[in-house]
């Protein structure tokens, strides 16, 4: 491993020990904000520190085994130990390289999830409902909280569009690769001839930004309309114009929120989604420029980005970005998504490593 990388790892290991000591300080325990920030930093440094300690131990093992090679009686055992230690050292170096990759500052944040029915009419709306249920199940398995911000139901079930906020540890980092087009191939319930139809939905995942980081939005650039809520919520829902529609005139982005009974709360929710959408559009533009020389696994949430196909007759799910096909569709639709998310996270890390080595 390069001396510069070892020096960086030593500094991170020292910082890990320093933060550990600070977390036991009574003054810091009393300051909740500082304590939370240091706890987050400690958690982020723990894996690197642990892996580096293991790597250092393996270097000692290699040195000991090399010294034993001079002893004829110990040579055979030493050669075996040396081979094992070198293998382990290589594995740990690969892990450390991944752990040192630049982190996306948004990865630890909550996220807004939008699922929209695309081509396919009623069947697309039903599939949007299935996708939202799949993500909700996945969130449940990770103990994340799902809060519906806005929804427009399909005429025969499902959703024309649904927006939810998902809160918990590392939500955006885990779900960000879901943005893009999702295609379904199945026989709709309304199909009497048993023909397979293809429908599509788009998914967009955006990080929730703290208020201080929301893009500056000029109030003059906003058109705010109020209207009466529709859908579930009891009689009260339809008695006041509590639902809000905000249009950002420069970009044409429209956000509706009618989940709360209070117009004020709906407006606050809609503005936070609007800020996230504007930020996501700016980020996508920047990433497109950066990724012009290499592929970008992060979809834009556009229907032209074809992420996955869910083929019900064959029980098959295919991720087109990494040519991964699994015949485990039932499990996927029940929210067991790690088997699809993990390979694409690893592929993304491999791309980042390749880009770093090109720079070097």
From Swiss-Prot:
Entry PTM: Methylated by PrmC. Methylation increases the termination efficiency of RF1.
**Keywords of the record:** Cytoplasm, Methylation, Protein biosynthesis
**Residue ranges, annotated region (Disordered):** 284-313
Q: Which GO terms describe its molecular function?
A: translation release factor activity, codon specific
InterPro entries, per database record: PCRF (IPR005139), Pep_chain_release_fac_I (IPR000352), Pep_chain_release_fac_I_sf (IPR045853), Prokaryotic/Mito_RF (IPR050057), RF-1 (IPR004373)
Q: Where does this protein reside within or beyond the cell?
A: Cytoplasm
Modified residue N5-methylglutamine is at which positions? 235
Task: Please name one Pfam family that this protein belongs to.
Answer: PCRF
Q: What's the superkingdom here?
A: Bacteria
Q: Which GO terms describe its cellular component?
A: cytoplasm
Protein's UniProt keywords contain Protein biosynthesis: yes
HAMAP family in alphabetical order: Rel_fac_1
Q: What is this protein called?
A: Peptide chain release factor 1
């Amino acid at each position: 491993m390069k001396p510069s990388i070892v020096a960086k790892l030593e500094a991170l290991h020292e910082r890990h020990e320093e933060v550990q000591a600070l977390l036991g300080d009574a003054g810091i325990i009393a300051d909740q904000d500082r304590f939370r920030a240091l706890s987050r930093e400690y958690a982020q440094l723990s894996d690197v520190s642990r892996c580096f300690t293991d790597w250092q131990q393996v270097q000692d093992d290699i040195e000991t085994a090399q010294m034993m090679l001079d002893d004829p009686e110990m040579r055979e055992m030493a050669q075996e130990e040396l081979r094992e230690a070198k293998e382990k050292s290589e594995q740990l170096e690969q892990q450390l390289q991944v752990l040192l990759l630049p982190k996306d500052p948004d990865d630890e944040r909550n996220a807004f999830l939008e699922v929209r029915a695309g081509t396919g009419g009623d069947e697309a709306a039903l599939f949007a409902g299935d996708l939202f249920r799949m993500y909700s199940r996945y969130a449940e398995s990770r103990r994340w909280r799902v809060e519906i911000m806005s929804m427009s139901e399909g005429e025969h079930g499902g959703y024309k569009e649904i927006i939810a906020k998902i809160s918990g540890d590392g939500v955006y980092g885990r779900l960000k690769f879901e943005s893009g087009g999702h295609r379904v191939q199945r026989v709709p319930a309304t199909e009497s001839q048993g023909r397979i139809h293809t429908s599509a939905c788009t998914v967009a995942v955006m990080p929730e930004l703290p208020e201080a980081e929301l893009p500056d939005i000029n109030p003059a650039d906003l058109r705010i309309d109020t209207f009466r809520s529709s859908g579930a919520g009891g009689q009260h829902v339809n008695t006041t114009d509590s639902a809000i529609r905000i249009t950002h005139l420069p970009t044409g982005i429209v956000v509706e929120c009618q989940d709360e009974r209070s117009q004020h709360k709906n407006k606050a929710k809609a503005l936070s989604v609007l800020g996230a959408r504007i930020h996501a559009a700016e980020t996508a533009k920047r990433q497109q420029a950066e990724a012009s020389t290499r592929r970008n696994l992060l979809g834009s949430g556009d229907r032209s980005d074809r992420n996955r196909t869910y083929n019900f007759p064959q029980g098959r799910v295919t991720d087109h970005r990494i040519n991964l096909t699994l015949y485990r569709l039932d499990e996927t639709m029940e929210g067991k998504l790690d088997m699809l998310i993990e390979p694409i996270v690893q592929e993304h890390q491999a791309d980042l490593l390749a880009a770093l080595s090109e720079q070097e």
